[in-house]
């Protein structure tokens, strides 16, 4: 107690350790907010430097999130994944971290790791439709069509208007030649968005498989009119012409696309 009063009345300065902590915190905040400003100004390289300097002082979860998103935008998925794995260890109860990690693993085509991340998200939040969708994508990447459909069906049950899940399920059903079930998904998607290009292309593939070449051609052409840069539409249409022995039309189409 006497030591306390002595230091209080004598006006002694803070200990070197306490002063260092204050300086470190100040420098951390400067680097962090400089990084955010750089990000807003469209200078990702400088933002990365600032966030990296900030994290060298303090491994703060929020700043790690900012940096991981930057790495994803810049295509540096290995660095993003390393950060996200650290974040998942720091805050293992956050679904969003595992969802982002699953998406990064998908970009890297590491489907087993993607499946693990999606399963961890589901363990935290069973009713998360996106997590079940990502699990379906992971099984699709491992060529497991039946489990892909099962997980996508769960996602759609949780979120009936989940366009991406319906499109992926339709694509998988096409592989299995289950056209009736596939068209239920296509019709549901087109009811929400009549100009959904992937849905129209898949509908064209069903018509083509059923021997309705002219109707398939209409769908493929419609997509090229909506979006002249949709390469898949030109490929499907060109392949249809080749199958119909319309080689002149196919060559002309591919020349136009190029």
Annotate each PLM feature:
Residues 28, 61-63, 95-96, 129-130, ...:
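Helix-start (N-cap) detector for alpha-helical repeat units in TPR-like alpha-solenoids
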Residues 40-41, 73-74, 107, 141-142, ...:
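Register position in tetratricopeptide repeats
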Residues 8-30, 53-56:
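TPR-adjacent "capping" and linker segments in tetratricopeptide-repeat scaffold/adaptor proteins
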Residues 25, 58-59, 92, 126, ...:
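Short coil turns that delineate tetratricopeptide repeat
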């Amino acid at each position: 107690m006497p030591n306390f009063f002595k230091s209080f009345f004598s006006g002694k300065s803070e200990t070197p350790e306490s002063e260092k902590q204050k300086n470190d915190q100040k420098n951390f905040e400067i680097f962090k907010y400089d990084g955010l400003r750089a990000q807003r100004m469209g200078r990702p390289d400088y933002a990365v430097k600032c966030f990296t300097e900030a994290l060298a002082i303090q491994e703060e979860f929020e700043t790690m999130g900012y940096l991981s998103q930057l790495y994803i935008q810049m295509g540096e998925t290995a660095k993003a994944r390393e950060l996200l794995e650290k974040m998942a260890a720091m805050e293992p109860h956050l679904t969003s971290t595992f969802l982002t990690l699953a998406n990064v693993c998908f970009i890297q085509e590491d489907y087993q790791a993607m499946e693990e991340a999606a399963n961890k998200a589901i363990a935290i939040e069973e009713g998360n439709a996106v997590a079940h969708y990502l699990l379906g994508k992971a099984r699709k990447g491992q060529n497991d069509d039946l489990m892909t459909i099962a997980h996508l069906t769960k996602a759609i049950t949780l979120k009936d208007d989940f366009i991406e899940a319906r499109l992926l399920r339709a694509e998988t059903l096409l592989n299995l030649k289950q056209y009736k079930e596939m068209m239920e998904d296509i019709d549901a998607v087109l009811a929400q968005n009549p100009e959904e290009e992937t849905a129209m292309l898949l509908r064209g593939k069903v018509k083509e498989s059923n021997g309705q070449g002219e109707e398939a051609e209409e769908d493929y052409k419609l997509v090229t009119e909506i979006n002249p840069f949709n390469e898949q539409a030109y490929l499907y249409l060109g392949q249809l012409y080749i199958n119909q022995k319309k080689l002149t039309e196919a060559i002309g189409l591919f020349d136009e696309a190029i």
